[in-house]
Amino acid sequence: MKHLTEMVEQHKRGNTNGIYAVCSAHPLVLEAAIRYAHANHTPLLIEATSNQVDQFGGYTGMTPADFRGFVYQLADSLNFPQSQLILGGDHLGPNRWQNLPAAQAMANADDLIKSYVAAGFKKIHLDCSMSCANDPIPLTDEIVAERAARLAKIAEETCREHFGESDLVYVIGTEVPVPGGAHETLTELEVTTPDAARATLEAHRHAFEKQGLSAIWPRIIGLVVQPGVEFDHTHIIDYQPQKAIALSAMVEAYDTLVFEAHSTDYQTPQSLRQLVKDHFAILKVGPALTFALREALFSLAAIEEELLPAKTSSGLRHVLESVMLDRPEYWQSHYHGDGNARRLARGYSYSDRVRYYWPDQQIDEAFARLVRNLADDPIPLPLISQYLPLQYARVREGDLNATPRELIISHIQDVLQQYHAACQGVTSQNA
């Protein structure tokens, strides 16, 4: 995948460049990202996680082929060239099947890898770090690496079978704590040590050699580490460059490798720029984008309440809360405290568990009604100023149409702009 190998080559030549990965399956988030990349003439990396998308459908109901079709169709409708799209698979391994014995979980992981690669995903994160039902806790580096090498061999074979050759690129390693934001309140975070990073690399190098995969080592472009960034429900641990000096220096010894940083959501623009400068050149972002989507929708719902009687309004906030209470499986084990604390977390937590509920039919119908209600007549400018002040400024300057969809897209793009600036070293206008 030339976009990514060229990015790494440029970074290794001393450029402070990188790339961000959009980790979301929400149509409005993806539309915002595609339009932003189109306006700024950059490639776009979109990633699906093993929880979202798998051979059985994941929680989105999409297989990898479905997800590719969905993204490509959206890109085509926005005149974004498919050649500029990069699809990635995140945390591919036995993650979804940790409750099964290792043999069964890895058999499922084999099929997971095949389905992603056959569908045209080119950036593959091999993550076999999680213990299965009959495994020791934690797994040794050697077991993790052996399982990753097994999956890499399947990926290479599948790519050659379907496309004639393999141009896959790989990311290895994992971060702590778990993907998608920490479950508990955080106060401090351990940065990955250089020795631990080297041990992960060497274990994987050895395991790849045993599988006859030494030739693909230059295509292992990323190592996932913990640079000291994380968020929980109400707090953010900001990047502290001085704590990552040794880790940052360590990767300079590897010609074709950069770090991949997960859970970079909600970092300041300055921290994002510093992360890229310090060789964390692949920045993952997901919850911050759906958090921005939720902010925009709550703002529009507040505007709707000001304009319309209750009987004709969408009641989006009420519908959302009702569905989340009826189906608590996506938030119950994450949000703690008394009733009020959990209510606030459902609506406003940085971990944004609400993102799992947007596809629900009742919520989607309320969203559609909200957009229809506010599209019928021009939204009064003072209300836009009250609830979406950054978008108000653009509307006043003539740079943004004050329609519900455009206001939502613009608000999401405010987050994307920070990542773009960190990776490109420039500040650009929204689409």
Swiss-Prot record:
Pathway in which this enzyme or protein is active: Carbohydrate metabolism; D-tagatose 6-phosphate degradation; D-glyceraldehyde 3-phosphate and glycerone phosphate from D-tagatose 6-phosphate: step 2/2
Role according to the record: Component of the tagatose-1,6-bisphosphate aldolase KbaYZ that is required for full activity and stability of the Y subunit. Could have a chaperone-like function for the proper and stable folding of KbaY. When expressed alone, KbaZ does not show any aldolase activity.
SUPFAM superfamilies: Aldolase (SSF51569)
Self-association state and partner proteins as the record states: Forms a complex with KbaY.
GO biological process, one term: carbohydrate metabolic process
Entry protein name: D-tagatose-1,6-bisphosphate aldolase subunit KbaZ
Superkingdom, natural source: Bacteria
Phylogenetic classification of the source organism: Bacteria, Pseudomonadati, Pseudomonadota, Gammaproteobacteria, Enterobacterales
A GO CC term assigned to this protein in UniProt: plasma membrane
Entry's family note: Belongs to the GatZ/KbaZ family. KbaZ subfamily.
